[in-house]
Swiss-Prot record:
The keyword Transmembrane does not apply. GO terms for molecular function: RNA binding; tRNA pseudouridine(55) synthase activity. Responsible for synthesis of pseudouridine from uracil-55 in the psi GC loop of transfer RNAs. This is tRNA pseudouridine synthase B. SUPFAM superfamilies: Pseudouridine synthase. Its EC number is 5.4.99.25. It is an enzyme of class 5 (isomerase). The gene is truB. InterPro entries: PsdUridine_synth_cat_dom_sf (IPR020103), PsdUridine_synth_N (IPR002501), tRNA_psdUridine_synth_TruB (IPR014780). It comes from Wolinella succinogenes (strain ATCC 29543 / DSM 1740 / CCUG 13145 / JCM 31913 / LMG 7466 / NCTC 11488 / FDC 602W) (Vibrio succinogenes).
Length: 291
């Protein structure tokens, strides 16, 4: 894939990533996203690292990871749509809508494949939903999952997700295997619960895998080139290198009066992300070292 040019790094190899690095990792099942990040930090000997888009502990799959200053790039990456593959267990009653907090299993008669497809088709588009109470969202400064574990009342706001595609892969009762293409921040556990609810039964996910975020997929531990995957056009600012280097105030006219929007200014040793707004040049990220 074009976006994944760069040096190849095996997770188990002895090579080290650069101090500033951006790459796609693959989190195993039954490990928190933070635990996985700490493991990568130890393996590659880095102190500063971060990830974008938490995966549930029971889920596996793509996790975008950055080391060093490149953690500042997360807000500028195009991570939509997110594509997931999941298995929904019909009749499984779980507080967390997965296999981690099972309350019981109900044996239910099978549905027709056509009925399942009809329900899934009706969920495509923009839908409102309530996140699972076992989630990382904060309520009054506390994590919802901590409150749920303490048997406290958890009241989460209604959210909106955009479901671009919801496809039935196969249905072997009581397991519904599906693939979903959704907007950033969506909860696939909630989507699975909605499918089951509309069928008239309990349901929870027995497996969940994130396949991609935008154009980013796991293809081995390869370093991504930021200038190839950032979604902004480049602007010629070669003659203003010193001004960019020191973050000096600039006007849009200094850059030829481009239309309002976000741009990348590339120089030999570094690049900057700027925004042209109301005739001004706003530095969003300045002096990001190139690797």
């Amino acid at each position: 894939m074009e976006a994944n040019k760069g040096k190849f790094y095996h997770e188990t190899g002895g090579e080290s990533l650069k101090p500033n690095a951006l790459f796609v990792g693959y989190k195993p099942m039954f490990m928190s996203s933070n635990h996985y990040l700490q493991r990568l930090k130890r393996r590659f000997g880095v102190k500063k690292a971060g990830y974008s888009g938490t995966l549930d502990p029971f889920a596996k799959g793509v996790l975008v990871v950055a080391f060093g200053h490149y953690t500042r790039l997360f807000d500028h990456l195009n991570q939509e749509p997110k594509v997931y593959r999941a298995t929904l267990w019909l009749g499984l009653h779980s507080d967390s809508l997965d296999i981690e907090n099972i309350l019981g299993v109900e044996v239910i008669p099978p549905y027709s494949k056509e009925r399942v497809e009809e329900i899934m088709g009706a969920l495509e588009g923009e839908i409102s939903y309530t996140p699972p109470k076992y989630c990382a969202k904060r309520i009054g400064g506390r994590r919802a999952y901590d409150m749920a574990r303490n048997k406290e009342e958890v009241e989460l706001p209604i959210l909106t997700m955009r479901v671009g595609r919801l496809s039935l892969l196969h249905y072997t009762h009581p397991f519904v295997h599906f693939e979903a293409e959704v907007s950033k921040g969506s909860y696939i556990r909630s989507l699975g619960g909605m499918i089951a609810s509309r069928l008239g039964c309990y349901g929870a996910l027995s497996s969940l895998e994130r396949l991609s975020e935008g154009e980013m997929r796991f293809e081995g531990y390869r370093e991504l080139e930021p200038l190839e995957i950032l979604p902004y056009p480049k602007i010629d600012a070669t003659s203003l290198k010193e001004e960019f280097l020191h973050g000096k105030k600039l006007l849009a006219s200094d850059l030829g009066n481009p239309k309002e929007g976000k741009y990348i200014a590339e120089f030999e040793e570094f690049f900057s992300i700027i925004e042209i707004k109301e005739g001004q040049v706003v530095y969003l990220l300045n002096r990001m070292e190139k690797c």
